[in-house]
Amino acid sequence: MPDIMTTYTFLSAKPSIMNNKAPTSKRDQLFAELLTEPSQFSFNESVVDVFPDMIQRSVPGYPTVVRMSGVLSEQYAKPNTCVYDLGCSLGESIRAAEIALNDRDCELVGIDNSAAMINRASETLGSTSKINWVLGDVTAMDYAQSSVVIMNFTLQFIPIERRLALLTKIRNAMIPGGLLILSEKLTMPDPEMDALMINLHHDFKRSQGYSDMEIAQKRDAIDNVLIPETAATHLDRLASAGFSRTRIWVQCLNFASFIAVA
């Protein structure tokens, strides 16, 4: 496995990746007014309109995860294989991979089950990109031979009982030495530490301009939609799916990114 410090050095030497900016969007004010009829969170047109702002202000460390998805893809992607981004949303991670790979002979595929996300990603990048956009359920897909699979904050939205089967399917489609990048919100096994991380995350969101009402209403909307797990649970499941080596490469509060080698 390449040394992680090497990848940080490599990142500094790649200004094209560092300058891969998020798509512009409106400011996220979806929960700024009191909602008399709260609804379950979904990735609809309203969310898509503000998504780049929402995720930047809600997920600590998100820009680093996106940029390093490109760096790691450059180190692991092999010609004549696929590079997948599962739950690609607006395609920031797969676009970072495309820039990093610099016309390497790989098929780049972004998959999401939100038509609003896929349509916006396709419209935004248009003819400037060779990424193939697919609308579909990542748990129901058949995957071609792949060398890199990116899942940034996707598995947490999939029912827990379907997560192992999906990871096993991904592993079985990978070439030996292929890489999975798996980023997730975490829960902590120690209740006091879990409460601390949640409170610190809320403080982070306040520092980004969210009000207490916005934080509370977003939390209520996303409960039972986003189901976090412990880091140990993720590592055990990756081993059960057949990955040979796994580790957390970055963590910020209760958000972490894992790498797993096939």
Predicted regions and their residues:
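Conserved alpha-helix/loop element of class I SAM-dependent methyltransferases that forms part
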Residues: 60-79
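A conserved beta-strand element that flanks and buttresses the S-adenosyl-L-methionine
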Residues: 150
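Conserved class I S-adenosyl-L-methionine
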Residues: 181-207
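A short glycine-rich, Lys/Arg-flanked "PGG" loop and its adjoining helix->strand segment in the class I
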Residues: 164-176
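Short alpha-helix
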Residues: 224-241
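N-terminal auxiliary segments of SAM/dcSAM-dependent transferases
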Residues: 8-11, 15-40
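Class I SAM-dependent methyltransferase SAM/SAH-binding core
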Residues: 84-85, 89-140
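Class I SAM-dependent methyltransferase Rossmann-like catalytic core
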Residues: 36-41, 45-66
